[in-house]
């Protein structure tokens, strides 16, 4: 069971080094399988604003960019990308930066023109379009001004500013297959109070679900309770940035707001969930049974 320290700290104040947290949890009976610093694979990559573009004098496919990276002077970077433009906010790997694919970026010259870094694509940052749905992935990644500011560390932008601990959960502790379950154990181990929050269930424009849907549970020995709820007027869209960050940190690929919230609840509460598109529910009925 993976848990990010930032998510854990929403429930209990354990502002201690990760080594101390692991030691306490081991003493409480939990084996630590791994500890991962998400920011360790990438350094010195920041959000930069392209101030000026001009053609390379000796290469038709290269452009010379003057980029504001939050310092006193713009940084010059030569790129072969054709999707960049003046005013674009882009990931800039500066001199002596390191990328998740193992690349070590240093300043140099491209066809005789000084280049003090590299502009980065999704792949070069270790991402795919599934990590950030709804974003055009070809060429250099064009950042959203609402998600970051000039000079901001890209690790912060993509949610890599976190540490993830993977605990082995034994079969006799199913209550710890969740963020809240592990937070409860951490609170007990450190003698700290646990911060609880009660979910608020709002009404739905869909009315009574059983006016629209029938649920049959023949496999009662395997599933003694199945709860369903219908939500109307749903708009499928990318999830908020904070939610995508938490999912990625805990090893879950973001898809869209509906799928992501079911996965989020599963991780936080340990309650498996699934969302169905009502248009494709055959005969308006859900049957919970063993596979045939």
Q: Could you say what each language-model-derived stretch is?
A:
Residues 5, 23, 63, 190, ...:
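Glycine/proline-enriched, intrinsically flexible loops and inter-domain linkers
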Residues 1-207:
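Phosphate-backbone binding interfaces of nucleic-acid-interacting proteins
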């Amino acid at each position: 069971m993976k848990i990010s320290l930032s998510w854990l700290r929403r429930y209990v104040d354990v502002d201690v080094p990760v080594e101390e947290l692991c030691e306490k949890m081991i003493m409480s009976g939990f084996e630590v399988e791994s500890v991962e610093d998400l920011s360790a694979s990438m350094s010195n990559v920041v959000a930069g604003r392209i101030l000026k573009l001009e053609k390379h004098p000796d290469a038709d496919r290269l452009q010379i960019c003057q980029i504001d990276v939050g310092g006193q002077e713009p940084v010059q970077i030569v790129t072969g990308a054709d999707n960049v433009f003046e005013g674009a906010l882009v990931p800039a790997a500066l001199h002596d930066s390191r990328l998740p694919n193992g690349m070590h970026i240093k300043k140099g010259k491209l066809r005789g023109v000084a280049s003090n870094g590299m502009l980065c694509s999704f792949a070069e940052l270790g991402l795919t379009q599934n990590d950030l749905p709804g974003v055009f992935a070809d060429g250099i990644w064009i950042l959203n001004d609402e998600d970051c500011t000039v000079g901001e560390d890209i690790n912060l932008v993509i949610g890599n500013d976190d540490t993830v601990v993977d605990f082995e959960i034994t079969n006799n502790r199913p209550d710890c297959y969740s963020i809240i379950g592990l937070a409860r154990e951490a609170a007990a181990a450190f003698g700290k109070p646990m911060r609880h929050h009660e979910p608020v269930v709002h009404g739905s424009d869909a009315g009574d679900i059983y006016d629209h849907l029938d649920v049959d549970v023949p496999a009662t020995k395997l599933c003694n309770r199945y709860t369903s709820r219908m939500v109307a007027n749903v708009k499928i869209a990318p999830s908020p940035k904070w939610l995508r960050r938490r999912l990625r940190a805990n090893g879950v690929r973001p898809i869209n707001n509906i799928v992501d919230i079911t996965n989020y609840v599963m991780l936080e509460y340990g309650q498996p969930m699934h969302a169905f598109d009502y248009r494709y529910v055959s005969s308006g009925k859900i049957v919970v049974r063993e596979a045939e």
